[in-house]
């Protein structure tokens, strides 16, 4: 072999070895860089060439085991005997290799609202001018009205709340559990006697074995019901009076297992068949404010709160309670008998009347004349007239179509 050719071949091997070292360093930098995936995609787009040596023409095995693109081999220029020069395509000198860019570290905390100090100063001036203008408007308003305008919004809110009074304040819920065999009414009244505030019944759940409901006037008296009844609703209230007692009453709606629904004002007792749970609420009334708002008409009932009681006046359930409070409503249900027209009844569920959707078995009720319910505007005893309808029902007549009573709608 010619000495020049051997020297040239030796230089090629050295350059190739140096180039492989540079490529390995670049690969290690790419692996440690956060932008490795992006650079890897960029290398996949580069053209790949199969390098061959000019002297032997044999393929050089790749040293990266196929993980990266094959390394480009040097291309030789014709040897003129003076110098040898190898050109490596896609080769980058070591001085041109730069370190990867480090990601910018984000500062912890809330970002600044204003980027420059000038913007912050302008915003501060704008806020100060707005506050000064609002203060000027308040002073002008005080000069016009001849008074002082409070700059504290919290004090104005407190004054508004203070003007409402103490009515309905100190509302506290209570749960009363009643064992089987005990009287629900007696338990509620005992709780009302122990409490120093007004009391109302919110809801109740459980079963009743024996109930006593008030009959409508003029017959009066109580009508007993025995059996297994489910409590649909229980409502009522007890209000303190000037004499130190409490007036009020309770009303109940019961449902039997056969589908009958009865209800009305409780007469004397309501015996629990199983565990009964009653939810009560105590609250406070502002009687001084109510007395001042009544205008001082001299009526004794104006000194207290005028609330409608579900029980008529008289001794409540034999417990020695003072008479009930004044009732201002009327029952829109009236009969055909003219002798009953002078009676004024209480409005809503819980009045002295009881209602019955279906007649209970074992109890036969007789009526001298069919009762009629009218909801039209011609009724003189119905303060809420103008309903625009006229319904009439007959009680005590059996019908195969609608069960225990027959309903007729006139033309």
UniProtKB/Swiss-Prot annotation:
<feature type="compositionally biased region" description="Polar residues">
    <location>
        <begin position="306"/>
        <end position="315"/>
    </location>
</feature>
<keyword id="KW-0238">DNA-binding</keyword>
<dbReference type="GO" id="GO:0003680">
    <property type="term" value="F:minor groove of adenine-thymine-rich DNA binding"/>
</dbReference>
<dbReference type="InterPro" id="IPR039605">
    <property type="entry name" value="AHL"/>
</dbReference>
<feature type="DNA-binding region" description="A.T hook">
    <location>
        <begin position="105"/>
        <end position="117"/>
    </location>
</feature>
<protein>
    <recommendedName>
        <fullName>AT-hook motif nuclear-localized protein 14</fullName>
    </recommendedName>
</protein>
<dbReference type="InterPro" id="IPR005175">
    <property type="entry name" value="PPC_dom"/>
</dbReference>
<feature type="short sequence motif" description="Bipartite nuclear localization signal">
    <location>
        <begin position="105"/>
        <end position="113"/>
    </location>
</feature>
<keyword id="KW-0804">Transcription</keyword>
<keyword id="KW-0539">Nucleus</keyword>
<feature type="compositionally biased region" description="Basic residues">
    <location>
        <begin position="7"/>
        <end position="19"/>
    </location>
</feature>
<feature type="domain" description="PPC">
    <location>
        <begin position="165"/>
        <end position="305"/>
    </location>
</feature>
<dbReference type="GO" id="GO:0005634">
    <property type="term" value="C:nucleus"/>
</dbReference>
<feature type="region of interest" description="Disordered">
    <location>
        <begin position="1"/>
        <end position="32"/>
    </location>
</feature>
<feature type="compositionally biased region" description="Low complexity">
    <location>
        <begin position="20"/>
        <end position="29"/>
    </location>
</feature>
<feature type="compositionally biased region" description="Low complexity">
    <location>
        <begin position="120"/>
        <end position="135"/>
    </location>
</feature>
<feature type="region of interest" description="Disordered">
    <location>
        <begin position="289"/>
        <end position="348"/>
    </location>
</feature>
<comment type="function">
    <text>Transcription factor that specifically binds AT-rich DNA sequences related to the nuclear matrix attachment regions (MARs).</text>
</comment>
<feature type="compositionally biased region" description="Low complexity">
    <location>
        <begin position="144"/>
        <end position="159"/>
    </location>
</feature>
<keyword id="KW-0805">Transcription regulation</keyword>
<feature type="compositionally biased region" description="Gly residues">
    <location>
        <begin position="374"/>
        <end position="390"/>
    </location>
</feature>
<feature type="region of interest" description="Disordered">
    <location>
        <begin position="54"/>
        <end position="164"/>
    </location>
</feature>
<feature type="compositionally biased region" description="Polar residues">
    <location>
        <begin position="54"/>
        <end position="66"/>
    </location>
</feature>
<feature type="region of interest" description="Disordered">
    <location>
        <begin position="366"/>
        <end position="411"/>
    </location>
</feature>
<dbReference type="Pfam" id="PF03479">
    <property type="entry name" value="PCC"/>
</dbReference>
């Amino acid at each position: 072999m010619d000495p020049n050719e051997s020297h040239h071949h030796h230089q090629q091997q050295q350059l190739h070895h140096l180039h492989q070292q540079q490529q390995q360093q670049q690969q290690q930098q790419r692996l440690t860089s956060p932008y490795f995936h992006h650079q890897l995609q960029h290398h996949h787009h580069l053209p790949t060439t199969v390098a061959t040596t000019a002297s032997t023409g044999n393929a050089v095995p790749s040293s990266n085991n196929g993980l990266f693109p094959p390394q480009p081999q040097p291309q030789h220029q014709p040897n003129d005997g003076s110098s040898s020069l190898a050109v490596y395509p896609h080769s980058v000198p070591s001085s041109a290799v730069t370190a990867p860019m480090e990601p910018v570290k984000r500062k912890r905390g809330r970002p600044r609202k204003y980027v420059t100090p000038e913007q912050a100063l302008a915003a501060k001036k704008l806020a100060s001018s707005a506050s000064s203008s609002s203060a000027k408007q308040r002073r002008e308003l005080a000069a016009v009205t001849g008074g002082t305008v409070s700059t504290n919004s919290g004090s104005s809110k407190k004054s508004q709340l203070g003007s409402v009074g103490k009515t309905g304040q100190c509302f506290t819920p209570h749960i009363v559990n009643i064992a089987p065999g005990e009287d629900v009414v007696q338990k509620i009244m005992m709780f009302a006697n122990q409490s120093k505030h007004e009391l109302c019944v919110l809801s109740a759940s459980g079963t009743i074995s024996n109930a006593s409901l008030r009959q409508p006037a003029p017959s009066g008296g109580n009508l007993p019901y025995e059996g297994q009844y489910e409590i649909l609703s229980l409502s009522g209230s007890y209000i303190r009076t000037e004499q130190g007692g409490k007036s009020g009453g309770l009303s109940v709606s019961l449902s039997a297992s056969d589908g009958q629904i009865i209800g009305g004002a409780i007469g004397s007792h309501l015996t629990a068949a199983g565990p009964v749970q009653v939810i009560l609420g105590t609250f406070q009334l502002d009687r001084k404010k109510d007395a001042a708002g009544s205008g001082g008409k001299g009526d004794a009932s104006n000194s207290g709160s005028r609330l409608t009681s579900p029980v008529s006046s008289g001794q409540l359930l034999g417990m020695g309670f003072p008479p009930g409070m004044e009732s201002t409503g009327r029952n829109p249900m009236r009969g055909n008998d003219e002798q009953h027209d002078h009676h004024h009844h209480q409005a809503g569920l819980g009045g002295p009347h009881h209602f019955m959707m279906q007649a209970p078995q074992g109890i036969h009720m007789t009526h001298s004349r069919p009762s009629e319910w009218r909801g039209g505007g011609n009724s003189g005893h119905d303060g809420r007239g103008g309903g625009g309808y006229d319904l009439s029902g007959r009680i005590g007549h059996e019908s195969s179509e609608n069960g225990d009573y027959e309903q007729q709608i006139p033309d």
